[in-house]
Amino acid sequence: MALNAKDDFDPVTLEIFWSRLISIADESAAALLRTSFSTIVRESNDFGTVLMDANGDSLSENTGGIPSFSGILPTTLKHFLAKYPKETWKPGDCVITNDPWLATGHLPDITMSMPIFRNDKLVGFSGSIAHSPDIGGSLWSADCRELYEEGLRIPPIKFLVEGEPNQDVEDMILGNVRLPDQVLGDLNAQVTANKVCGRRLVEFLDDSELDDLTRLSTDLQGRAEQAMRNAIEEVPDGAYHATLDADGFDEDETHIECTVTVKGSNLKIDYAGTSKQINRGLNTVMNYTHAYSAYPVKCALDPYTPRNEGSYRPIEVVAPEGSILNPRYPAPCNARQLTGHLLAGVIYGALVQAVPEKVIADSGSAPSMRAVFSGVNPMGNRFTQILFASGGMGACPAKDGLATTAFPTNAGAGSIEAFESVAPLIVWKKELRVDSGGAGAFRGGLGQECEIEVRSEDELQLSLLSDRWRHPALGVLGGLPGAPSQIRFSDGTVPHQKSRTSISPGARLHMVYAGGGGYGDPKDRDPARVRDDVKNGYVSAAAAKRDYGVS
């Protein structure tokens, strides 16, 4: 171990230690992935793992985890510590919650944390969050009118007590869900992940001859904070304003007002003027609002420094209490991603006025659309299966947007084979959508088309979580908007975009996903790239002539 005169770690040692802490979070994530039961975790990547110091501040997160999870988990741990002070934790304890106001903003996400001891001294905490395959109540949906309809709410409570299951808590959870085996399997996978994280941290401290993480966490978080401050200082001081509208629920369209104020090395995001909270599940609690505000700033201004607690210290996020971005309890919030995922677009709409070379156009992948199917499969087993699929990312300042990429979330689509293996559903089509990317000097990412047939003997329940039907992803600096989303049945009927319904045997659901917005004037696009797009089937000949003037 190498220290300088100030008792700081030298840069080489710090980089080695930082990389190893990230690898610990990655190994924890691999354990969760490999031992989970549900496809939502092992196929769609809807989970995250975080290593935190003894104060509950984040040190490292798994590569490719859900961005909001790593941003929120330290906040949730501090709520755990408020109920269970540090001196009361014992080796093997595991505290759990899914309270939206304390954790990730909706009930399906379950947060767990365990203490890490070395030589009887508390040196840190491991944490994991995973989207449960079921949490009771309604299906994952947007049409509930208050939190109590949306499922089981678990207050902070010990799931394990000194390594032993708290059977009463386990029984309470499993007695309120449709898929108890899968739910318990995923909960145990989270416990396994947390234990792996703890073991590997102790090994790291032994190998590094460190008594604890105190100096290292101070140094790592300080470096991350300074990197973010340096990046913010490159943005001209000023207040930058943008708005964004979304479909909302029925007549309650969502309007987001955003002012990004930069002063020196500090950045403030203020959502004053945003729509009030509604009695449908689109409300986004402040934890989630903060996470999906800070993350796009990090992506734009300081994308390469690994994230930890220090990355967020220069960023302040405020939203009016009672707004859709800071609702009062017990507002419904089950589909909060349909609002929270939009924040990157409006933040970039503000920052493009100051640093156009650092931001992307609005993304059709935000918000991510979901279709939730539930019923009984031919073997007589209850199932709930979620189709994860994405629209296109917004175009970049010097690059086309990525097709069908889940920005700002990292949830994956998963394989069709896995999707079909647990439910009486057949996917007949899953392909890129021609002409869906917004035209520009750099084209928006393509959306996709999916067609799914019900092969059960009985009706299934379907919950749709979608947006961008009326408000497509916007282009910037002369770029055109991407194509909007659309959902319909094979008989031509159009379902409610955010509600539950029954779907009959033999019915086919056709889902069309939005494209990303374009960046820059389409007439500035290299004609050779337009012709390549036509050749590859991304852009039709008619659109090439209409939007780009290329034939």
Name these PLM-found stretches.
Residues 94:
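Glycine-rich phosphate-binding loop of nucleotide-binding enzymes
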Residues 2-91, 99-118, 122-551:
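Glycine/proline-enriched, intrinsically flexible loops and inter-domain linkers
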